[in-house]
Curated annotation (Swiss-Prot):
This is Putative uncharacterized protein YJL026C-A. Residues 48-73 are annotated as: Disordered. Completely overlaps RNR2. Residues 63-73 have a biased composition (Polar residues). It comes from Saccharomyces cerevisiae (strain ATCC 204508 / S288c).
Amino acid sequence: MAGSGLFFKWANNKHAKSVCKPSSLQINSLEKVKPGIIPLFFNQKMEAKEPEKKTPSMEAKATSLSPNKASAS
């Protein structure tokens, strides 16, 4: 049983290192950016900041509705 336990630990260690260690192709793909092409992760960061700009403000809606409420009452 002691021998099989050591083999199990060795197999798990080998697998864990291969999962955590990115390949050289993955690393190079992040470093080499062609001119005019923006990496995907950069676009995702920009989109996360933009929704506040695209949605109309609630204050503008409230001010446009307030004259109607004043004339109705």
